[in-house]
Amino acid sequence: MTNDSASRTPSDNTELTEMQRYVTQQRGTEPAFSGKLLHNKRTGVYHCLCCQAPLFYSDSKYDSGCGWPSFDQPVSSEAVRYLEDDSHNMRRIEIRCGQCDAHLGHVFPDGPKTTGERYCVNSASLSFIDDVDGERVDG
């Protein structure tokens, strides 16, 4: 796995927006309640914006009220990787794309009863592909 974050771009070779670059390459966080995919209710799959690896199914998304898209589990155990994050004087678990290492967000142990986990993900790190019409929406 490479750590050359400056060379990563979305799979269609378009440029990352400033916010997408900040989130995925610099471990940033978009402002709460600002993400394009926060209120998305369509059926489909959420992919990594940078490499298009599948990350979360829409049926695992729920409204946690935290201001970022929340999921109770990834599509597979290999979809995301976990790192300890002690930044900002907090102990958290960072989640990154299991394929390209792009920063996604964090996972917390306060999720729904199904898994007990809340994957709190920045919209700017995701692409959504609709199951019905195949439309792709980048966060």
From Swiss-Prot:
Q: Which cofactor does it need?
A: Zn(2+)
Reaction catalysed by this chain? Answer: L-methionyl-[protein] + [thioredoxin]-disulfide + H2O = L-methionyl-(R)-S-oxide-[protein] + [thioredoxin]-dithiol
Q: State its Enzyme Commission number(s).
A: 1.8.4.12
What is one term from the GO cellular component aspect held by the record?
cytoplasm
Q: Where is the signal peptide?
A: none
Q: Provide the coiled-coil residue spans.
A: none
Q: Which major enzyme category is it?
A: oxidoreductase
- Which protein family is it in? Belongs to the MsrB Met sulfoxide reductase family.
Identify this protein by name. Answer: Peptide methionine sulfoxide reductase MsrB
